[in-house]
Amino acid sequence: MATCFWLRSCGARRLGSTFPGCRLRPRAGGLVPASGPAPGPAQLRCYAGGLAGLSAALLRTDSFVGGRWLPAAATFPVQDPASGAALGMVADCGVREARAAVRAAYEAFCSWREVSAKERSSLLRKWYNLMIQNKDDLARIITAESGKPLKEAHGEILYSAFFLEWFSEEARRVYGDIIYTPAKDRRALVLKQPIGVAAVITPWNFPSAMITRKVGAALAAGCTVVVKPAEDTPFSALALAELASQAGIPSGVYNVIPCSRKNAKEVGEAICTDPLVSKISFTGSTTTGKILLHHAANSVKRVSMELGGLAPFIVFDSANVDQAVAGALASKFRNTGQTCVCSNRFLVQRGIHDAFVKAFAEAMKKNLHVGNGFEEGTTQGPLINEKAVEKVEKQVNDAVSKGATIVTGGKRHQLGKNFFEPTLLCNVTQDMLCTHEETFGPLAPVIKFDTEEEAIAIANAADVGLAGYFYSQDPAQIWRVAEQLEVGMVGVNEGLISSVECPFGGVKQSGLGREGSKYGIDEYLELKYVCYGGL
């Protein structure tokens, strides 16, 4: 069993006897929960002591395959991005473990697809209930491994759990069709059937929600999954596996294979090219998405891709400045700017430009507080690693060298190497890196424009199109701009747009397919036409 550190000394408690640790085992004729003691407690370390009292059963370090916790031949370290301290050593899965996980998922699929929609719904609901019961501990795991402020981590856990709740309900609403044909002795049926095993590859910035948004839909449809979590944040995926086991999700239905950055490429390729895998779902960079699309093309697998963004945030002269500033803070600085729908380019009309920049700078200084995610009042945690900081630094230096002005921020924060000051730039032009490279950090560059047509042209001058935002009080303009923005999601006078009930996804090179909403489950279903003759 892979090892972790420190938790024994902080008095971690175990889950109560109502939900004892258990594993799952196959049985002839079906898949059932298996009894037996869970492995011993994992131990994590966080310099802020934020994991004291955490449920030890949630702190897993081995892979979860076929309902069993399995070690790997090697381990890799997971670090607290705030302090750089080691949180623990996690199983470093390779190609062999990846193929074993796919086989386990495929064997489980043969039985899981036959489980009634009502029963699948019930199991997903139990999983949701367990997430809610353990929400505080799950949030602290997120903060420990990603650096996200604890308040935001709590928000992510609720968001994550709501996907399980939503798809537990959608599981019972997978309807087909009856089509009356021209021939009197025939009837045509359209069935919806689960596609098979899904390979799920998730990012570090939402280590829980990006799993349940995919896995909830897959399991509701009758598919099984192999999850490869980001190497920076494997603990959240493994904690979800523990709760899935407790909920009674059968062996092999949900599998997790953590791996190091060194093994990530070969493990990703192994699960995406395996002939037993029918579906690939990925959230991450456009560059990596293209590689996975190439893997999928060789065997024509179904894909869902939620890739990079370069979200414009447009402020027209008619906008309410206070509302626009509030929306800008929310859309830019959530998770320290590390979300795919974060505003990356601020386009502000000349007549309101100076007032907006002044108010935005004041709001940033007043409301954004850099610190460790476990500390009360922190709104801006660390970036995930030093490479992310270097990217922000590079964009700031490039912009300044080309004539941009630093209004506030602009440099690394004194707290440590992974912290960067929330930064606002003005006098930004379109030849600067920050206007055509996704930042993924706390940098807000402001471009001044004159006309609506100019703003639309700048906003659409990108090969990606995930989200876009704009503020206006002109009803006619609202309709024009909303329809003309080349993005998959639009926020009108609103900076936070994600919801489990609404479809999430982009256009252009921002991806393929939609997640969440009533449309999300269709990504894991095949249509089958049945012609019934001789009537």
UniProtKB/Swiss-Prot annotation:
Keywords: Acetylation, Disulfide bond, Mitochondrion, NAD, Oxidoreductase, Phosphoprotein, Transit peptide. The keyword Transmembrane does not apply. Residues 1-47 form a transit peptide. NAD(+) binds at residues 213, 228-231, 284-289. The record marks 205 as: Transition state stabilizer. GO terms for cellular component: mitochondrion. It catalyses: succinate semialdehyde + NAD(+) + H2O = succinate + NADH + 2 H(+). Substrate binds at residues 213, 334, 498. Its main location: mitochondrion. One of its GO terms (biological process) is succinate metabolic process. One of its GO terms (molecular function) is identical protein binding. InterPro entries: Ald_DH/histidinol_DH (IPR016161), Ald_DH_C (IPR016163), Ald_DH_CS_CYS (IPR016160), Ald_DH_CS_GLU (IPR029510), Ald_DH_N (IPR016162), Aldehyde_DH_dom (IPR015590), Aldehyde_DH_Superfamily (IPR050740), Succ_semiAld_DH (IPR010102). It holds the Pfam family Aldedh. The active site is at residues 306, 340. The modification Phosphoserine is found at residue 499. Its EC number is 1.2.1.24. PROSITE patterns: ALDEHYDE_DEHYDR_CYS (PS00070), ALDEHYDE_DEHYDR_GLU (PS00687). Transmembrane segments: none annotated. Redox-regulated. Inhibited under oxydizing conditions. It is found in: Mitochondrion. The modification N6-succinyllysine is found at residues 126, 135, 184, 265, 402. The modification N6-acetyllysine is found at residues 126, 265, 365, 411. Disulfide bonds join 340-342. Catalyzes one step in the degradation of the inhibitory neurotransmitter gamma-aminobutyric acid (GABA). Belongs to the aldehyde dehydrogenase family. This is Succinate-semialdehyde dehydrogenase, mitochondrial.
